[in-house]
Amino acid sequence: MFRGNHPTRIDDKGRLKVPADFKREIEDKFQNQTFYVTSFNGKEARLYPMEEWERFEAKLAALPSLNPTRQKLLNVSNYYGQVVEMDGQGRVTIPGLLREAAEIKGEVAVMGFLQYLVVRNAEHLKNEIESAPFTAEDEKTLSDLGI
């Protein structure tokens, strides 16, 4: 499982050097070094190891093909999405369209979201956390869900 925040930088060519802890996890757990890089909202890049993305796709494929939410998710995830290989130096290129939309450049936060990684503009993330903090109501919601 991926967890934690590992701040880093995106280089001028849009390449992210996968933080060492995450790279080790990928090498240990997954057969290949291929990712599906996408977004569901244009504010972040989601880096799914291909095996994880394929599990997610299988669940989507099981939904009725005319389900409007399924169609919406496929539209946005395919619009931003590309299959990307991690190079020999442990770098992954974030697609240009997604980099522009999410303003992913310079300083970024690379966070573990259990099955995948999220890359966010560090300043935007900090502002979002400060403007919408985790509250007691959020804790209660999780408690009601058994967490």
From Swiss-Prot:
GO molecular function, one term: DNA-binding transcription factor activity
One of the Pfam families matching this protein, by short name: MraZ
Location of the protein in the cell: Cytoplasm, Nucleoid
Keyword DNA-binding attached: yes
Keyword Repeat: yes
Stored CDD domains: MraZ_C (cd16321), MraZ_N (cd16320)
SpoVT-AbrB domain ranges (all copies): 5-52, 81-124
UniProt keywords, alphabetically: Cytoplasm, DNA-binding, Repeat, Transcription, Transcription regulation
UniProt signal peptide: none
UniProt record similarity statement: Belongs to the MraZ family.
Protein known as: Transcriptional regulator MraZ
Organism for this UniProt entry: Koribacter versatilis (strain Ellin345)
Gene from which the chain derives: mraZ
